Amino acid sequence: MRRFLPILLAFTLLTSLAACGAAPSASAGSGGGSSASGSAASSSAASEPEKPQLEPYEISDPKVEPAGGEKDGVPYVAWDGVVEHLFFHPVIAYPELAFDGDAQSNGLDDWMVTVGEYNKILQSVYEKGYILVDMHDIWSESTDASGNPVMVKTTLYVPEGKKPLVLSFDDVNYYPYMLEDGFTYKLIIGDDGLIWTEGKDPQGNEVISQDLDATTILDKFVREHPDFSPFGAKGCFSLTGYCGILGYRTQTEREDTSAAHEANRQKEIEAVKPIIAELKRTGWTFGSHTWGHINLATKSLETVKADTQKWMDEVGSLVGPTNIIFYPHGARPDGDDVKQTGPIFQYLQSQGFQVFASVGISSYSKIKSDTCAVICDRLHPDGTTLRGSDKVLGWYSQFYDARDIIDLSVRPDLGVKWTPKAS
């Protein structure tokens, strides 16, 4: 059994949590708490600051073998094996706010990791020889003997002794509930030109940091360990649209069609554009998570069409075209059957999607023989798997030992299913 549906379907909890509204507006640079910088440029700054001179960021193609089979004295070899894939939801910056005993605490425990756990996972996969690659480089479109379009797996050339890894990040939208539950809530560009985040600490102080969010932590880790990303890849954002993107309220509202709402929406659209540009410049890419985080296994074709058009209009128009869709709830379309190439799957293909990503117990992938598409699964480091049985721990053992990762001192007292290490 490749897929672990019971825990996936339970993720509907997060959708119910994420009711949208106006996000609180922090004054960037007002600082406090664990801010990693004394100042940063807010999107709402009264005057446009002088743009800093950014260090060049090199993105190279892992499908091209380096001249002479080596680069910077490091041999590169062909990789035709499995490309592993881990995905995360937003990481918890302040566990004391996330796990405060309210109705959301257990759901957050299930589906999230803390900043400390995320840092340990990155360190572990780095030490185990994984390197980051762009999900878009794993498969490409070709033609078969009859001239029909087909997807093919590409050969990657990686440093000898290294193993390719894809990271993806669901719901990087900064839903309004997150501010009260210990998450950061917006990406911004700092005075140094780099990506930072805004948030609030448990005392209510506004904090600008690079140490409290999955995006900025990974950026920082790659700066400190450039060999972790020899091609410049970071991760792929899996975005919905119903609460805007990246902390900016770019969405239309059925309940509010006023001129004031539209004016604010346009302001948010302009504010997020430089964020998107900097993310793209530094190796981040984008995929669809549907506009409304809809369950593709149960929705009608007409609902999927309307949702997809809204995603294209409100998200794709900002982040650019993508051929990747990440299934909400891990639920495949047309009855959640991996073998189906039904009308919803075909419609999504017609809109440019070629890589269809679900969630499972391995980095499974299959090139479909009846159409030009790839289906794949991702593994999910989170509370459900960190607390899991010895069997579940085995699914992740090539990346880390969950017993070394989970921080039971900050999580709810819900127990674990694995066998403790021998003392």
Where do the PLM segments sit?
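Positively charged n-region of N-terminal signal peptides that target proteins for export
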Residues: 1-7, 21
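Hydrophobic helical h-region of N-terminal Sec-dependent signal peptides
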Residues: 9-14
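C-terminal motif of bacterial Sec signal peptides marking the signal peptidase cleavage site
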Residues: 16-19
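Short, low-complexity, disordered segments immediately C-terminal to signal peptides
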Residues: 21-50
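C-terminal active-site subregion of NodB/CE4 polysaccharide deacetylases
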Residues: 48-135, 151-167, 178-179, 285, ...
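Active-site beta->alpha N-cap acidic-glycine motif
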Residues: 78-97, 101-278, 282, 333
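Alpha-helical scaffold elements lining the catalytic groove of polysaccharide deacetylases
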Residues: 249-285, 291-319, 337
